[in-house]
């Protein structure tokens, strides 16, 4: 039985002390929950999970604040994002994917530590997620081009457009958290009919 050194995969704990409200990161002053990996990197015989960091332990008041902020931003389809030109929304999505790639190494390591995936599978999940974002951008360009013309069916002319659906709650599953959250987020905010 060969033990692999975990030194190359070690990460410094990330302590998140902010949450998103009204498009801005707001400082969290309340309680936090620590996030641990089940992987023990200590050499002693006693089990000791590895601290990965901490996250805000949001209470109902802050959760409602975030929800109301999201509803206000959508504004029943009249908010900035849903009324933004398609090309501008696509630029935002591309900028997000580009910035996401800048953090590939740390996200891959977090997937390894937090859910116990090996490096190859973690890299595949990250790369597949980023590729999905870029593919969604390309497909939406095609959809937008084809929807720019009127269609006729049974003597009725129609102009069908796609747009963001609105506010969604997205919980990531344990096995593919990055993929599932990205798929749900993109479909709800960009490409649904």
What are these regions (language model features)?
Residues 1-55, 91-95, 127, 142-172:
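Terminal low-complexity tails and localization/encapsulation signals of metabolic enzymes
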Residues 35-37, 60-63, 152, 178:
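A short local loop/turn or secondary-structure capping micro-motif enriched for an aromatic residue
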Residues 41-144:
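Glycine-rich loop-to-alpha-helix module at the N-terminal edge of alpha/beta enzyme cores
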Residues 173-183:
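Conserved coil-to-alpha-helix start sites within the AMP-binding
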Residues 184-193:
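Conserved small/polar residues in nucleotide/adenosyl-binding loops
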């Amino acid at each position: 039985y060969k033990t692999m050194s975990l030194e190359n995969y070690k990460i410094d704990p990330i302590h998140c002390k902010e949450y998103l409200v009204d498009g801005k990161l707001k400082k969290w002053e309340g309680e936090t929950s620590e996030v641990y990996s089940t992987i023990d990197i200590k050499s002693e015989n006693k089990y000791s999970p590895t601290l990965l960091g901490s996250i805000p332990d949001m209470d109902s008041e802050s959760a409602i604040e975030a929800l109301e902020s999201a509803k206000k931003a959508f504004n029943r389809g009249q908010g900035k994002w849903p009324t933004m030109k398609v090309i501008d929304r696509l630029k935002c999505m591309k900028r997000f994917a580009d910035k996401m790639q800048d953090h590939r190494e740390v996200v891959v390591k977090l997937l390894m530590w937090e859910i116990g995936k090996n490096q190859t599978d973690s890299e595949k999940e990250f790369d597949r997620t980023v590729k999905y974002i870029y593919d969604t951008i390309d497909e939406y360009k095609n959809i937008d081009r084809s929807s720019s013309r009127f269609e006729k069916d049974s003597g009725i002319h129609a102009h069908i457009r796609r747009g963001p659906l609105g506010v969604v709650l997205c919980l990531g599953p344990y096995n593919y958290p990055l993929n599932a959250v990205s798929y749900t987020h993109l479909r709800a905010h960009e490409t649904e009919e």
